[in-house]
A protein has these predicted regions:
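Sec-dependent N-terminal signal peptides
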Residues: 28-37
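Non-catalytic, well-ordered alpha-helical segments in soluble enzyme domains
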Residues: 77, 154-163, 406-443, 509-510, ...
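Short, small-residue-biased leader/transition segments that mark boundaries at the very start
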Residues: 1-4, 43
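Beta-strand elements within well-structured catalytic alpha/beta cores of enzymes
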Residues: 48-60, 79, 105, 161, ...
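Short, structured active-site-proximal loop/turn typified by the sulfatase FGly-forming signature C/S-X-P-X-R
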Residues: 64-113, 170-174
């Protein structure tokens, strides 16, 4: 019996020992899992030291696909293979252009809130077109133009970063044009730089305080664009047989474009060639070399704009070798930029945001003899007939129509007020009259958009205009129709409502490669970036962050 008891107690002691070891092992494994999870989360969710926003004006996702076999491994392909890729972003308004697109991307709000509905606006008192950012209160540095972000009514990503860091973060932007440079920088940025159209120097506005010494040196030194201009010739980079993405190219001769200050529009033309992207890179590399990005206690931000549209803005034909060469060279420029970021700051410490502007200028004329549905809409004739119609109703003592600009008709508000007429009634009568014109698809009134009387068809007009600059009538023409301004200096515009595929890529900062085929809104970009930075979104943001980049996912 004693033996049995001793054996039983021994078995009991052994069982206790096994259980104790199991408990200890369980605790060790649990601790290891917790450490691994925390380490993984920290790797994925740390705040980046640098944010680089790369926006390509007129980027087309389908062109990236068409020209893919000509690209190297570390440009477009690196973005697509190593990034979190969204197949397409969508802008919620029509008539997208450079200014409205950039304002939307960097504020997270459509023009109805940001105030930026287009590159230009029309000053009817002075009877001239001016930049939406024109501001005579500020002088230009290295330019005679006057700009400021005063007409941008929303804060930007950079503004919120400056506020959160109490000014310690550096925020800069570089772009071909003033509109994209200033709108991607914002109100509180350290600086915004663009290429001046008359001297080719990197210009800015006195709204921003100070110019980095290396920008001054670049503008005035032996590396300046003016000192190299005569040697810059754009010819095919690849053998001619490599430009095989389009079967519609009929011209077998290689193209050749030169740039000289002797010719008018020298610098504007260069800004629509692949050389502008190389010049952008030259300056961006100066910032990365001397700007101390990623070394401060708070994150820094650098916004870069490339160009991927047609040469001279529009070409007389589409499917050209020029556009294929533009993308081929842009691929090399992206590769050089990413490699430099990796070397100077580290892509693991950098959030790269890559996307496009959501539109593409296409003004190809139809071949002779080819009939396509459509006609010509003449705004001047339309205004004259509308004024005669309103005179017949309200009297001939004044002109009731002020002007036309960018698919909008502006009535003479002062005359209407002096006559004590009801603006809503007059707008409605004018809209009913214009709706009868050939080629007019839809007309809506500014008053109806202001008071909330819109539907799915007219909501895009509300999103794409701001009430302070909105016309009394907004006109949408049928596809295929031409807008003829009866001005020999202005090109006839062909109405095309093509959707443009615009990819969105987030890369670096511990993000894992992934392809998302869900369409996202352009207003989701800014709040996503600020979420990764752990700061407030811009103050007019209309969307939430993309959930794939939310902290904790």
């Amino acid at each position: 019996g004693d033996v049995y008891k001793r054996q039983d107690l021994g078995s009991f002691g052994l069982g206790c020992l096994q259980k104790d070891m199991e408990n200890r092992m369980r605790k060790i494994i649990t601790s290891l899992i917790a450490i691994l999870v925390v380490t993984n989360l920290e790797a994925q969710q740390r705040t980046p030291k640098l944010v680089v926003c790369i926006t390509v004006d007129q980027l087309r996702g389908d062109y990236i696909e068409y020209f893919y076999n000509t690209f190297g491994e570390r440009g477009f392909k690196r973005l697509m293979n190593e990034g979190l890729v969204y197949n397409n972003i969508r802008f919620e308004f029509s008539d997208i252009d450079q200014a409205s697109a950039f304002a939307t991307l960097f504020t997270g709000s459509n023009p109805c809130f940001s105030g930026i509905a287009g590159d230009k606006t029309f000053d009817f008192e002075k009877e001239k077109e001016v930049s939406i950012l024109n501001d005579p209160e500020y002088l230009g540095n290295y330019t005679k133009e006057n700009y400021s972000p005063k007409n941008l009514f929303s804060s930007t990503i950079g503004d919120e970063l400056k506020i959160a860091s109490q000014g310690r973060s550096d925020v800069y932007s570089i772009a071909p044009d003033a509109e994209s440079a200033i709108l991607s920088a914002g109100h509180a940025a350290n600086g915004a730089f663009w290429m001046d159209n008359t001297n080719g120097k990197w210009a800015t506005t006195t709204y921003y305080k100070g110019i980095p010494w290396y920008v001054d040196r670049y503008n005035n030194g032996p590396e300046s664009l003016a000192s190299r201009l005569e040697t810059m010739v754009w010819t095919p980079t690849l053998p001619m047989e490599k430009y095989d993405a389009f079967p519609y190219v009929l011209d077998d001769l290689p193209f050749r474009y030169t740039f000289s200050e002797k010719f008018a529009n020298c610098y504007p033309n260069l800004k629509t060639s692949p050389f502008i992207n190389k010049e952008i890179n030259r300056l961006a590399l100066q910032f990365l070399e001397y700007g101390g990005f990623g070394t401060r206690s708070c994150p820094d931000m650098l916004s870069i704009t490339y160009y991927a549209g047609n040469y001279r803005g529009t070409m007389s034909k589409e499917y050209t070798r020029e556009i294929q060469d533009t993308y081929y060279q842009l691929d090399q420029d992206i590769e050089k930029l990413l490699d430099t970021i990796d070397k100077k700051v580290g892509l693991a410490n950098t959030l790269v945001v890559f996307t496009g502007s959501g539109y593409y200028k296409s003004e190809e004329s139809y071949p002779d003899g080819l009939m396509v549905n459509g006609g010509e809409f003449h705004p001047k004739r339309c205004l004259a007939l509308l004024n005669m119609y309103l005179m017949a109703i309200y009297g001939q003592h004044t002109s009731w129509v002020q002007g036309y600009y960018n698919n909008q008709i502006y009535l003479n508000r002062k005359a209407i007020e002096d006559a004590k007429l009801d603006l809503t009634t007059l707008q409605n009568k004018a809209a009913e009259f214009i709706q009868e014109f050939s080629g007019v698809q839809l007309v809506t009134t500014g008053r109806s958009l202001l008071t909330g009387d819109w539907n799915e068809g007219t909501a895009k007009f509300r999103q794409g205009t701001h009430h302070l600059r909105r016309g009394d009538l907004i006109i949408e023409l049928q596809p295929g129709w031409k807008v003829n301004l009866d001005n020999p200096k202005e090109k006839v515009k062909i109405i095309r409502n093509n959707a443009v595929i615009t990819p969105l890529v987030f890369m670096g900062n511990g993000l894992k490669p992934q392809h998302i085929y869900r369409e996202v809104k352009a207003t989701e970009v800014a709040p996503t970036v600020t979420h990764v930075l752990r700061i407030r979104p811009p103050n007019a943001t209309q969307s939430l962050p993309l959930w794939e980049l939310k902290i904790g996912n």
